[in-house]
Amino acid sequence: ANNLYTTVINKWDKDTLSNGRFFVKLTEKLTLNYEGDTDHRDTLETFSYASGTGNIVEKINWGQVTGTASGTYSDTGSDKFTTTFDYATSSTYNIYALPSRETMTDQSGNKVRESKFYYDTLSIGSVTKGNLTKQEMWVSSSTYIDIEKTYDTYGLVVTEKDARDKTTTYTYD
C-alpha cells in the first residue's frame, strides 16, 4: 500500500531579461515509473526555447532511459523522437507564439509527423489576427489532409471544413 509508483524530476533554468526579470524554463523532465517495488522504467523529455520569445523550439522525447533518483540518466536505445516548432510572427501586431509548423522525426531523422498552421488566410508563418484558417496534417510523401475554418468579424468560427471535405456551419445568437 505504501509503494512508490512514479517520480518526476524536473530541471529548470532561467534566462535573464531586462529590468531584473527572468524567463524560467523547464529544460528536462525525467520520469521514473516504478513497478510497485524498486524496479523502474524511465523516460526523459528535454526542451529548448527561443531566447527572444520564450517559445519552445525543440522537444526531444528520448524514450526509454536509465534514470536515477538524483536526476541523472543515460540513453538506452534508439527510440528517440524530436519535435521542432516554428512560429507565425507579426512584429506589427506583437504576435509571436502561434505555431506555424510542428515536425516530428525519429532517431534516424525520418519525418513521422508534421502539422502546418495557417492564420488569417495568409501564407505559412504570417499572421495579423490569429484566426487559425487552415491546418494541414502530413500523411506521406507530399500528401497532406487539411481542416479549414472561416470567421466572422468578431473572430467566431462560421464554417469548418473537415479532412473529408464535410462542412459544418455555425450560427450564433
What does each model-identified segment do?
Residues 1-173:
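Non-catalytic interaction/targeting regions
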